Design a protein with these regions (language model features):
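Pre-active-site segment of Zn-dependent metallo-hydrolases
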Residues: 13-53, 58-65, 113-125, 153-164
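Active-site-proximal loop/helix segments of hydrolase catalytic cores
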Residues: 120-129, 134-189
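Active-site environment of divalent metal-dependent phosphoester hydrolases
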Residues: 30-31, 53-58, 78-81, 96-99, ...
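Beta-strand-turn-beta hairpins that frame and shape the catalytic cleft
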Residues: 1-3, 15-22, 97-106, 135-147, ...
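Zn-dependent metallo-beta-lactamase
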Residues: 1-21, 27-32, 213-221, 226-232
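Binuclear metal-ion centers of metallo-dependent hydrolases, dominated by the metallo-beta-lactamase
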Residues: 70, 82-97, 185, 189-235
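Active-site neighborhood of phospho(di)ester-bond hydrolases with catalytic His/Asp-centered motifs
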Residues: 23-26, 44-52, 72-75, 147-151, ...
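Glycine/small-residue-rich loop that forms an oxyanion/phosphate-binding "nest" at active or ligand-binding sites
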Residues: 58-124
C-alpha cells in the first residue's frame, strides 16, 4: 500500500508501493504546526515543490542538498534551486508530464503568485502549479494510484479535466491565500475524487478553519480524511 503522511500546512510525505519516498512542498523548520524538522527526514528520493514561496520551497532545497533527492518543479524554480547547490533537478512546465521510477507526474494549472523566496533580484519568478501523479503499482497491487496535490490555488475550471482521474486529492481549505472551504467543496464537485485530504489551514490565524465543518460541507461528495501533523493515510 502507498502511504501519505501529513506534516502540516501543504507538506505531505508519500511512500509509494514501489519503494520511492517523495515529499510535497516541504515546510518544516519554521512551521509552527509541523511534527518534524528537516533534520528528522530520512531517506528521500524526490522533492516536489509547487511554487517558490517561503512556506513551500526553501526547506526543499535543504532536504535535496542533504539527502541527494531530485527536486521536481517548474523550470525557473528548479534553475534557482541549482544556484543554491541542489545537484539533481528535473525541470518541467505546466501541462507537461514525465515518467519517473515512481510513475507519471504532470504539472497542473494553479492560480497563485509565483515569486521565489531567496531570489532577491527577481530573476526566477515562475508559475505556481499543482502535481498529478499516476503511481506505478507495486507487487500485489491491483493497479496504480492517482494523487492530486493542487498546490496553493484558487478554484479553477480546469480542475474539471481531472474528473474521474484522482483517487486522493490534497486540497487547500484555508481561504485568504488560497481557496476556502466553499470553493474547495466546489473543486471536489469538479474532480470527483475518491478521497480528499484538506491542507493549508490552521498554520496561522488568517487561515484558521474547522476541518470538521468542511467534512460536513462536503457531505456525500467524497470521503474526507482529516489528518493531524504526523498522521498517515494508507491507500
Amino acid at each position: 500500500m502507498a502511504r501519505l503522511t501529513f506534516h502540516g500546512h501543504a507538506c505531505f510525505e508519500l511512500a509509494t508501493d514501489t519503494g520511492s519516498n517523495l515529499m510535497f512542498d516541504p515546510f518544516l523548520d519554521d512551521n509552527p504546526i509541523a511534527d518534524i524538522g528537516t533534520a528528522d527526514v530520512g531517506k528521500l528520493d524526490y522533492v516536489l515543490c509547487s511554487h517558490g514561496h517561503f512556506d513551500h520551497f526553501p526547506d526543499g532545497i535543504k532536504l535535496a542538498r542533504r539527502t541527494g533527492a531530485t527536486m521536481i518543479g517548474a523550470f525557473e524554480l528548479m534553475a534557482f534551486a541549482e544556484t543554491q547547490g541542489v545537484e539533481k533537478t528535473h525541470k518541467m512546465n505546466v501541462g507537461g508530464g514525465h515518467t519517473f521510477p515512481f510513475g507519471y507526474a504532470k504539472l497542473t494549472p494553479a492560480l497563485h503568485s509565483g515569486t521565489v523566496a531567496g531570489d532577491n533580484a527577481g530573476a526566477f519568478t515562475t508559475l505556481a502549479h499543482g502535481f498529478w501523479l499516476d503511481l506505478k503499482p507495486g507487487p500485489g497491487s491491483e493497479g496504480g494510484k492517482r494523487v492530486y496535490h493542487s498546490g496553493d490555488t484558487a478554484l479553477l475550471m480546469e480542475m474539471q479535466l481531472l474528473r474521474g482521474r484522482v483517487d486522493v486529492a490534497l486540497l487547500p481549505i484555508g481561504d485568504n491565500f488560497t481557496m476556502g472551504p466553499e470553493d474547495a467543496a466546489r473543486a471536489i464537485e469538479f474532480i470527483a475524487p475518491r478521497v480528499v485530504i484538506p491542507m493549508h489551514y490552521n498554520t496561522w490565524d488568517p487561515i484558521a478553519q474547522d476541518p470538521n465543518a468542511f467534512v460536513r460541507r462536503v457531505g456525500p461528495l467524497a470521503e474526507v480524511v482529516v489528518l493531524n501533523p504526523g498522521e498517515s493515510y494508507e491507500f
